[in-house]
Amino acid sequence: MEDLAKFLFGVSGNVIALFLFLSPVPTFWRIIRRKSTEDFSGVPYNMTLINCLLSAWYGLPFVSPNNILVSTINGAGAVIETAYVVVFLVFASTHKTRLRTLGLAAAVASVFAAVALVSLLALHGQHRKLLCGVAATVCSICMYASPLSIMRLVIKTKSVEYMPFLMSLAVFLCGTSWFIYGLLGRDPFVTIPNGCGSFLGAVQLVLYAIYRNNKGAGGGSGGKQAGDDDVEMAEGRNNKVADGGAADDDSTAGGKAGTEV
């Protein structure tokens, strides 16, 4: 019964995480249509890519037995994020943006290759699992912490305009599903980061409940409603906030953070 419950929560986590991975599609359709990345940042997609690669590697049977569902969704996520990065490279608005994205992609490939090679050639058994698990967990926690800038923006503007309800709910449900999956599998490398994700998702929902009647109250956003642009903010766009300043560069909302396991 415990194995069945673990499997069901893993499948649930896969479905919700896939929704989160695909949430930036409207943003990239806009980039392709306009043939420019405009003021979007490619950093969140590179960061999500390294997290997906490390998590997918960790879930492989020769690293962490009985965690194949971790590999399936993160493998799919790695393919999707790679496509996003390629779009950024092709349609970069400036040469500097293209070089920066290419440099980050090279760093991602180097870090993943280093972890994979060391774990394969120098480590075995629990030592291999420990290295890969720690690497994946550190990246996951960093990704889950990224919505803090969006939450700060919500508190500052007293508006949930940049934090769509469905995205926040999906982050909470995804983090919770993988948290329970990790508990049932007694795997701290799945439980710890996703426990953080579930908690931050819950905080986002609380903030939404507090400020839900203040959509568009931030002023300088031109009355923009939840929709593609909200998702774009969630994916790291350098959006302008009410006081005329820029939101934190390269920030990501729960949409991406919520996919890491």
From Swiss-Prot:
Highly expressed in leaves. Expressed at very low levels in roots, stems and panicles. Residues 1-6, 64-71, 123-129, 186-189 are extracellular. Residues 218-261 are annotated as: Disordered. Residues 7-95, 133-215 form the MtN3/slv domain. Disulfide bonds: none annotated. The keyword S-adenosyl-L-methionine does not apply. Forms homodimers. It comes from Oryza sativa subsp. japonica. It catalyses: D-glucose(out) = D-glucose(in); D-galactose(in) = D-galactose(out). InterPro entries: SWEET, SWEET_rpt. Mediates transport of sugars across the plasma membrane. Can transport glucose and galactose, but not fructose, mannose and sucrose. It is found in: Cell membrane. GO terms for cellular component: membrane; plasma membrane. Disruption phenotype: Reduced contents of sucrose, glucose, fructose, starch and galactose. Carbon starvation in leaves at filling stage. Decreased chlorophyll levels, damage to the chloroplast structure, increased reactive oxygen species (ROS) accumulation in leaves, leading to leaf cell death and premature senescence phenotype at filling stage. Belongs to the SWEET sugar transporter family. Keywords: Cell membrane, Membrane, Repeat, Sugar transport, Transmembrane, Transmembrane helix, Transport. The chain crosses the membrane at residues 7-27, 43-63, 72-92, 102-122, 130-150, 165-185, 190-210. This is Bidirectional sugar transporter SWEET1b. The keyword Signal does not apply.
